[in-house]
Amino acid sequence: MDKELAEKVEKRRTFAIISHPDAGKTTITEQMLLFGGVIRKAGTVKARKTGNFATSDWMEIEKKRGISVTSSVMQFEYKGKRINILDTPGHQDFSEDTYRTLMAVDSAVMVIDSAKGIEPQTKKLFKVVKQRGIPIFTFMNKLDRDGRPPLDLIAELEDLLGIEGVAMNWPIGSGQTLKGLYDIANNRVELYRKDGEDRFLPLNDDGTLPDSEALSQDPQFKDTLDEIELIKEAGNKFNREKIAMGDQTPVFFGSALTNFGVETFLNSFVDLAPAPESHTVNEDEELSPEDPEFSGFVFKIQANMNPNHRDRIAFVRIGSGEFKKGLDVTLARTGKPIRLNNATEFMSSERVQVSDAVAGDIVGLYDTGNFQIGDSIYSGKRKIVYPALPEFTPELFMRVTAKNVMKQKSFHKGMNQLVQEGAIQLYRNYQTDEYILGAVGQLQFEVFQFRMKNEYNSEVEMNSIGHRVARWIDPEQLDPQMSNSRNLLVKDRYGNPLFLFENEFAERFFRDKYPDIKLTEKL
């Protein structure tokens, strides 16, 4: 084993942040970047009029609407560790991008609005993380506002998500009466100060404050002591093994907006989160991150991160070995050799040329059309193929045409590049070859329309076709005569045939009429 490579890999902490929209995910990301020294000022997503946009929201539509619609990658050094943050869209219409991103991380941070508790999108994303069996860390956000009782929030983790919650700190008040946090893990009190200055009070051996501290006589602090005693007696016991397996989540309270409790959370996270671990490749082989042969997989493709160059970047999670500039790799899907001369690291849309990266890191490769989402690349003679990434079956479909027939070239270029990102699916009518777009949610169409105009100067006309159910069919079983007014025969961008049904009733009618025909769907 290469000792130097092993030491580099051990320093990596690669994680995604998941939440329901508006729980504060992007804000806590910015505060972490502040502690990492990569930005000097956090811009809140609400501050669109001031121009203080969130660092992770780099796309033009994100700045205009104050939402994240694409996963961002940010990297920085912190306390001797290399931190790779993947900030994901919270909006449910972009869950496919988020799901794929979750395949590229070693742990996850779940941000919950303490006034609302666990919300639908958080629940969906948690299931994906849970299936992967990776550690999950919970940040109960917005403590500076009135919220639900902390004991209820902890109980909800087990009731709704089926995961043990173990409190690492505990609120002393909330909202207007917030006094601070009782730091169980570090045996101290972190006082709440609106100026953002840290002030910590050490606790006595018995967990109380010295009598000389005014807070020791505060009724809220005494209530907190009662709750702490209850937690220690009846609550879940901290267990590193359970955390590593994803069966227990350390819970931290705080306020990302006022930067309260974030540094304490980050310090604990860096200590508890895992370094990169082995991947299953070639269906049943374990591949160590310290394996000397480089390998990785493409989990995201992004067009126009630099609108001036109209480029495409393939995001690669390195699974093993070390990347060096000029590395020769093989694209597993085609067997094509590729030399990796230009690779970048990220601070959202900002890029830095990288000459060295190891397992756990995320690098961006300039893509001239070689890569597809889910592709595996490897440097040695041994072929390495990572597991397939999840694909979703769209539920909304629209016909799309260029408003200006004289701009067909930019229309087709924009269409092809945005579809290759995987956030929207492209189909073509089997008979007429007209374009049909498929998406999980309406917002994806709006973003597509905006980006076509903004990035490709191509205005598009979009009309709903009213079909909601997509099912693939074996080409050998296909008879075009099966198509009628209630099921539209189309082909996906790989040429595979499928039917778009009006609704589930139309699908059932088809299945009853053709019982020997096998129809399949994606996620």
UniProtKB/Swiss-Prot annotation:
It comes from the Bacteria. It is found in: Cytoplasm. Keywords: Cytoplasm, GTP-binding, Nucleotide-binding, Protein biosynthesis. PROSITE patterns: G_TR_1, G_TR_2. One of its GO terms (cellular component) is cytosol. Residues 10-277 form the tr-type G domain. Belongs to the TRAFAC class translation factor GTPase superfamily. Classic translation factor GTPase family. PrfC subfamily. This is Peptide chain release factor 3. HAMAP family: Rel_fac_3. SUPFAM superfamilies: EF-G C-terminal domain-like (SSF54980), P-loop containing nucleoside triphosphate hydrolases (SSF52540), Translation proteins (SSF50447). Increases the formation of ribosomal termination complexes and stimulates activities of RF-1 and RF-2. It binds guanine nucleotides and has strong preference for UGA stop codons. It may interact directly with the ribosome. The stimulation of RF-1 and RF-2 is significantly reduced by GTP and GDP, but not by GMP.
